[in-house]
């Protein structure tokens, strides 16, 4: 089994190292990750700035680009082979609900999916790296069990997986979930620069809004691993009929 691993926290992030260490003895693993933290870069590609591939002392390769750049370059010119699985993470903090729209971790996994490869985005729920080894072991077990079920190397699929920051034995079983929703993000943070200009920092993510039973928020709050299948199609299929009536009345020719 050949696995490509990326992340959005950067090639030196503990979560990336832990995921690699957990899988290196059971698969042929290659790491291609961003040089710097690229959180919230979603699916962004770098189109107007040259990028360079460098080799770290531990063998990881890193690129001065986004997570999606890293996977794109790896799959279209760097590796020289097609991996069986693309993994992203382990992210430092949750990617649940609306987070998935912004997440560079999900964006990296989605880039693999767009190239027809099964992909998983792994995240820990809290941002303190606590019990990271447990999360990495759970990620390893999930990958191995999926391999045993012949799901890897098959037709493409995309999964978002959030793992609670608990000990290995405290983490409950996997629950298949839908995405929840967050409230709108908190207000921007303003500061005055040494030159007197106003600086703006994006505020923290909003708290959970839809955390009902069946959501990723609910599952992880009970100690479960939340697993959500994702898709790329953003079409609102339920409202196509409504908008068809409106579109029929528009005269823009």
From Swiss-Prot:
Q: Which GO terms describe its molecular function?
A: 3'-nucleotidase activity; 5'-nucleotidase activity; exopolyphosphatase activity; metal ion binding; nucleotide binding
- Cofactor binding description: Binds 1 divalent metal cation per subunit.
- For binding a divalent metal cation, which residues are annotated in this chain's numbering? 8-9, 39, 91
- Kindly state which reaction or reactions the protein catalyses: a ribonucleoside 5'-phosphate + H2O = a ribonucleoside + phosphate
So what EC number does this one have? 3.1.3.5
Q: Which cofactor does it need?
A: a divalent metal cation
Disulfide bonds, which pairs?
A: none
Gene Ontology annotations for the cellular component aspect, listed alphabetically? cytoplasm
Task: Give the superkingdom in one word.
Answer: Bacteria
Q: Where in the cell is it found?
A: Cytoplasm
Q: What are the UniProt keywords, alphabetically?
A: Cytoplasm, Hydrolase, Metal-binding, Nucleotide-binding
- Explain the purpose of this protein: Nucleotidase that shows phosphatase activity on nucleoside 5'-monophosphates.
HAMAP family membership: SurE
Q: Which family does it belong to?
A: Belongs to the SurE nucleotidase family.
Q: Can you say what this protein is called?
A: 5'-nucleotidase SurE
- The primary gene name is surE
């Amino acid at each position: 089994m050949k696995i490509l691993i990326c992340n959005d926290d950067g090639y030196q992030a503990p979560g990336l190292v832990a995921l690699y260490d957990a899988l290196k003895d059971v698969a042929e693993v290659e790491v291609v990750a961003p040089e710097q933290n690229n959180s919230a870069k979603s699916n962004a590609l770098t189109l107007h700035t040259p990028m360079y591939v460098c080799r770290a002392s531990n063998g990881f390769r890193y690129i001065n680009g986004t997570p999606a750049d890293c996977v794109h370059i790896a799959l279209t010119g760097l590796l020289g082979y097609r991996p069986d699985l693309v993994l992203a993470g382990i992210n430092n903090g949750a990617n649940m609900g609306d987070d998935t729209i912004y997440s560079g971790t999900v964006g990296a996994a989605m880039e693999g999916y767009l190239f027809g490869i099964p992909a998983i985005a792994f995240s820990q729920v809290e941002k303190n790296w606590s019990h990271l080894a447990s999360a990495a072991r759970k990620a390893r077990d999930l990958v191995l069990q999926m391999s045993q079920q012949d799901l890897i190397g098959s037709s493409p699929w995309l999964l978002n997986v959030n793992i609670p920051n608990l000990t290995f034995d405290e983490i409950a079983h996997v629950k298949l979930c839908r995405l929840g929703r967050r409230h709108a993000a908190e207000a921007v943070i303003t500061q005055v620069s040494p030159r007197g200009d106003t600086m703006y920092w994006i505020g923290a993510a909003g708290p959970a809004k839809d955390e009902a039973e069946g959501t990723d928020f609910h599952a992880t709050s009970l100690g479960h691993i939340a697993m959500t299948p994702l898709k790329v199609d953003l079409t609102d299929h339920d409202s196509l009929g409504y908008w068809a009536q409106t579109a029929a009345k528009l005269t823009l020719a």
